[in-house]
Each structure stands twice: as structure tokens, then as C-alpha cells.
Amino acid sequence: MLQPKRTKFRKTHKGRNRGLAQNGNKVSFGTFGLKATGRGRMTARQIEAARRAMTRHVKRQGKIWIRVFPDKPITNKPLEVRMGKGKGSVEYWVAEIQPGKVLYEMEGVSEELAREAFDLAARKLPFKTTFVTRTVM
């Protein structure tokens, strides 16, 4: 599972996920990409599940890039614990996703196969996505 090796602070504020993706909104490495059209949180488990689905579908040919990293800790208090007594312990890590962010990229496979693989990956994710291709200037 993806998570940072070390962080400056163990726990973070909740924050708000607003606006559009300013960075990572173009296909940079591969030929095809999976771009988020909705917003939400993508857990490390979801990132891995989508990666596995794509890798299995393309039968490990071509190359896949993961363009997101879960760098935000999400805390949780145990069941049946009263309020107060501090913030809960870190349960899992998420990547905050804004619309326009490219999540995965792929090259070395046909467009049809890439579309099918990205469709399988999109079913593992909690927001809407779209298939994009690299635009050559």
C-alpha cells in the first residue's frame, strides 16, 4: 500500500477539497490517461485495486504510470469511545482529487485495450472519470 515514508506532522486538519486541478491535469508520460471529472478522496487501497485491475487486463504489457500519491492521513476513533480525549489514530491514507487530475497513464497498448483497462479501473473509484489521449503540439 502507498503511504509516505515520513511526514513532518502525524495528523492533519480535515480541510476542504475545492477548485480544479492546477497541476497534473495533462497526460505527460504515456499516450492514454484516466482523468477525474468528479472530486473526492482516493484511498491507497483504491489506487492499488485500480492498478491491479488495469495490469491484469493488459496482461502486463505496455507501461502504467500512477500519477497520484496518498499523502493525507485520515484518523478514526475506536468504536464506543466517548468524545474528547484527543484526535484518533491514523487509520489510512488518501489522495485528495480535484476535477481535471490525471490519475493513471498508459502506453505500449492499443487504444481499445487501454479504454477497456481504464474502464475496469474506473469502477474501483468513488468518483467519475474520463478517458483522455495525449495531445501532441
From Swiss-Prot:
Residues 1-17 have a biased composition (Basic residues). Residues 1-23 are annotated as: Disordered. InterPro entries: Ribosomal_uL16 (IPR047873), Ribosomal_uL16_bact-type (IPR000114), Ribosomal_uL16_CS (IPR020798), Ribosomal_uL16_dom (IPR016180), Ribosomal_uL16_sf (IPR036920). Keywords: Ribonucleoprotein, Ribosomal protein, RNA-binding, rRNA-binding, tRNA-binding. GO terms for cellular component: cytosolic large ribosomal subunit. The keyword Magnesium does not apply. GO terms for biological process: translation. The keyword tRNA-binding applies. One of its GO terms (molecular function) is tRNA binding. HAMAP family: Ribosomal_uL16. Binds 23S rRNA and is also seen to make contacts with the A and possibly P site tRNAs. Belongs to the universal ribosomal protein uL16 family. Part of the 50S ribosomal subunit. This is Large ribosomal subunit protein uL16. The lineage of its organism: Bacteria, Pseudomonadati, Pseudomonadota, Gammaproteobacteria, Alteromonadales. The gene is rplP.
